[in-house]
Amino acid sequence: MVVLENPEAGPEEAAAAARVVPGGRRTLPLPGCLPALASSQVKRLSASRRKQHFINQAVRNSDLVPKAKGRKSLQRLENTQYLLTLLETDGATPGPEDGDLAPPAAPGIFAEACSNETYVEIWNDFMNRSGEEQERVLRYLEDEGKSKARRRGPTRGEDRRREDPAYTPRECFQRISRRLRAVLKRSRIPMETLETWEERLLRFFSVSPQAVYTAMLDNSFERLLLHAICQYMDLISASADLEGKRQMKVSNRHLDFLPPGLLLSAYLEQRS
């Protein structure tokens, strides 16, 4: 049975969790994922040769054969290939000790990791684990990255939508489907109804941009107007039958809600 480490443990607890194995070497557990294994001996070599050493070790541990046999073997192969892409995208060039007389490029992230003893121990610990444990570590790291992105909130690109030319009143109107645009141009639109729905959506999504707005609408023309408003505001709308009635659901595709500077009702009045 695998016992997970506490991902929120402080530096003192992490140091206490580290074990000393015969030979005086410490083993560091992978934080929040897996228990520690006895670390393997690593020669003190240059960063570039250490990289080659880890690559060779990864190939040996991946059980490479002409045709991988079994699910575990395939899983270990996929995990190893994923990790080796870190080296392929690193961009570091060989140094003078490898026969290159040109000045060495600045070390990349992978090269720096190879020269850090703590990272070396974690790398060896990872490569000595089974395919299932490696997959578990990768899933943990991926989930951690997603949770950090959610905690950071909306990106700057979304905050610049007010100045983005794609969000001018004219471009917002072009987002409306051709059929709905034709109806808005040819029909006599009840502006009071249009303004009422605009006010409801503005009030709702300004307070809860990630919530879902629902409304029961039996009037087909009113549903059409609501769809047009949603497309103009870059919202997502859908209607479905619910107990013999039509229910509208509206949601926001962005993390925050930034309505156009000119609402649809005002834009239509300008065009008339």
Curated annotation (Swiss-Prot):
Disulfide bonds: none annotated. Signal peptide: none annotated. GO terms for molecular function: nucleic acid binding. Transmembrane segments: none annotated. GO terms for cellular component: nucleus. It is found in: Nucleus. Keywords: Nucleus. The keyword Nucleus applies. Residues 141-167 are annotated as: Disordered. Residues 155-165 have a biased composition (Basic and acidic residues). Residues 191-254 form the R3H domain. This is R3H domain-containing protein 4. It comes from Bos taurus. The gene is R3HDM4.
